[in-house]
Amino acid sequence: MGSLPAGVSREGNHLLTANVSSVPTLAEQLGFAADDRVVIINCDDLGSSNAANTGIYDSLRHGLATSASLMVPCPWAREAAARYRGDDVGVHLTLNSEYDNYRWGPITHAPSLLDGDGGFPRTVEDVWDHADLDEVRRELSAQIERAILWGFDITHLDSHMGTVQLRPEFFDIYLDLAVEFALPLRLSGASTERVVGFPFRQLARDEGVVFPDHFILVTGVGSRRAIERAIGNLRPGVTEMYVHPAIDTPEVRSFAPDWASRVDDHHLMTLDTELPTMMKRAGVHPIGFRPLRDLQRAGA
């Protein structure tokens, strides 16, 4: 996903509109008990590199991961499409290209979304300061439509680096696309909502858009300990965690300063022998985003 703006929390939770027994929780609507702990483990940055594609599909098919998010504008997105087998994959809506030596840009004619290098801006703030909102809407819609054209059964939307979630005028587009394509969203929690100063969770709820109750980032070398803590502290409801798996190659080492963290995430998802047992003992129920999408489309 990349870095969020200063002061914005990566984790938190949202409270459902009503906590009365007559209103089913999201978990209950998905067929679980109200006090069950349900977890989506999403792999961000599918399509960003061959190393990411290999690590993410391995994590989905042979590991603990339950969903992934595709960066349509990236050079390796077509290869990700060629390797797709009906996995739970959403669109990682992308308006930034954060690396110095590896660049990508819009798939539509969008001059306001280009920086001096001919790619997307490196920072979230640069997008916020210079992007034309009509160009943003066209670009993000085109990213979703291209993923569908490539054959992906899109399960959800989320935002690379949080760019389209954390400002009201950009969030309006994010929410409109979720309604138009009938897709659930990744949304940060209450602490982030207080920082950014607008009620994005309630706005999504009012439009019938489904989103997980809680949101946690697990990142950095040694992320196993972070996941252990997260599992031990899970609240009832649906929690999304996201990671960035990649295999260790010269490619990923050449462009990603955090390559070691990404390799560690792949090991965590596929090679750790204790974590699956820990999750089972904790009564954690893994799911992808597809059940949330189907719930939203059913009008629940």
PLM segments and residue spans:
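N-terminal pre-catalytic segment of deacetylase/amide-hydrolase enzymes
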Residues: S3-I40
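Active-site beta-loop-alpha junctions enriched in small/polar residues
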Residues: D44-L46, M71-P75, H92-N96, H160-G162, ...
